[in-house]
């Protein structure tokens, strides 16, 4: 079990304690994400593809940096580019996860919501443990067992916080994204520790 309020408090405290690295890495990720949509014309399309590839590398490194901070390590900003060996596995799970959720949404919506929540930690698990795609999804399913409603509420809170950050001229995302990332890792660690003996 975990506390949503405690996870948000933890996220806020960790963001403040590591503000420089948190904001700088978030700014990079958002900036690359903003230009990864491609555009009209061959050059813009190629640029968009390259930016999308770079974004995946950055997203992997971003998660790794925040995991290391949570584990009392001292990562550097340049470390955001050093987790590229996970690129193909992360790309695979980034495709498989939304496909599963989409199929679930087609099945009267409720299965999609269930699967979205139960598999929500799979990308983070992959980055944290270097497990395979299927193993990461199985692990996410296992650690979230018995916590569906609490996790659904948690992800709603995460969405609201980031939406409010977006409304603040987008600048608020430089705060809300690190806070919710640390909060997500807090919940992930709590669920991993409390996995044994839980039933849905």
Predicted stretch roles:
Residues 2-32, 74-103, 115-166, 197-200:
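Interfacial aromatic "cap" segments that immediately flank transmembrane helices
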Residues 35-40:
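Juxtamembrane "helix-exit" motif on the non-cytosolic side of transmembrane helices
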Residues 41-71, 98-138, 162-197:
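Selective recognition of hydrophobic, aromatic-rich stretches within alpha-helical transmembrane segments
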């Amino acid at each position: 079990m975990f506390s949503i309020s405690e996870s948000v408090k933890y996220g806020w405290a960790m963001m403040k304690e590591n503000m420089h690295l948190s904001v700088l890495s978030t700014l990079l990720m958002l900036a690359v994400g903003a230009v990864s949509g491609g555009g009209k014309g061959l050059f813009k399309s190629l640029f968009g593809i390259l930016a999308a590839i770079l974004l995946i590398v950055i997203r992997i490194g971003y998660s790794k940096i925040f995991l290391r901070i949570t584990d009392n390590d001292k990562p550097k900003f340049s470390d955001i580019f050093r987790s590229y060996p996970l690129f193909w596995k992360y790309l695979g799970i980034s495709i498989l996860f939304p496909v599963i959720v989409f199929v679930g949404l087609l099945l009267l919506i409720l299965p999609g919501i269930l699967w979205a929540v139960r598999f929500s930690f799979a990308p983070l698990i992959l980055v944290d443990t270097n497990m395979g795609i299927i193993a990461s999804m199985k692990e996410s399913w296992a650690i979230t067992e018995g916590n569906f409603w609490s996790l659904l509420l948690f992800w709603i809170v995460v969405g609201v916080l980031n939406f409010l950050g977006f409304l603040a001229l987008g600048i608020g995302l430089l705060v809300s994204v690190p806070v919710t990332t640390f909060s997500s890792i807090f919940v992930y660690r709590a669920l991993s520790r409390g996995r044994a003996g839980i039933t849905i």
